[in-house]
Amino acid sequence: MSILQSFTFQELKNLLPNRAKDSHKGNFGKVLICAGSPGMGGAGILASEASLFCGSGLVTLVTDTSNVSSSLLRNPEVMITGVDMVEGVNIDLKIKDHNVILYGPG
């Protein structure tokens, strides 16, 4: 017996719940991603993009300031906070306000 199963995109779409017409991004999960050393923003960009693709409502990326421009160009719908990853920083991320936290991909 194989654990692999094939499906069509239409079959997958039928498994997803319908979103209410009066819903908004705050109804579909808040994701906080902390990623991206200076000049190494790819993992943060890809993680935030994957989060949006999976249906997350609100995605916030905290990354080094050198990665902010490229992150915004790739995914303007992601909220981005630039910090100095070398010096270290203490910012209020309001962790309790998020449903998912991804720390350090890449």
Predicted segment positions?
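Small-residue (G/A/S/T)-rich helix-start motifs and N-terminal tracts that mark the onset
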Residues: 1-106
